Amino acid sequence: CGCNGPLTISQVRMKLRDYAGENDAWGAIEFSDAEIVNAMTLPINHFNGTTPLGVTFDACTWPQIWQSRWLDATVAQLMLTAAYNYMRNARNIQTAGGVTEDRNQRWKAYMSLSQGVWQEFQLWAKATKATMNWNGGFGTLGGTSPLY
């Protein structure tokens, strides 16, 4: 890209600790590269579609100062994807020792985490776009740097 430096798959995996050795439940990565790339596009698309419309970004032009928000929102989308999968496949399994277990019951925790982080991103996007719109209409205060 040569611009601000987009998120990388490695950064997302590191935030999630999504490595085969770390996922003791199944010994494999949880998210494919394609799922991660798709999840990376969703926060930017949401930001661009948030009113007031006008300023838009892509993976290359997303401001570096907002990188952590993009990363958190990407993780939220991956957690939502996983929550839907776990919810769809949830079932109780009786083990030989008589213990009922279902690793897919984690969907509730994934869903809750995802919704909280995504809602925070949505509120931030709305406030940031409003500030950008205000600055675009009235300029900046005390210098040449925008207030966002």
Model-derived features: where do they sit?
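A structural signal for short hydrophobic/aromatic patches embedded in well-ordered alpha helices
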Residues: 39, 70, 109-110
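Short, intrinsically disordered/low-complexity patches at protein termini
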Residues: 94-95, 126
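Short, solvent-exposed secondary-structure capping/transition elements
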Residues: 52, 79-92
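Eukaryote-specific, cytoplasm-facing alpha-helical/coiled-coil scaffolding segments in long proteins
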Residues: 96-108
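Short, hydrophobic/amphipathic alpha-helical patches that form generic packing surfaces
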Residues: 45, 68-84
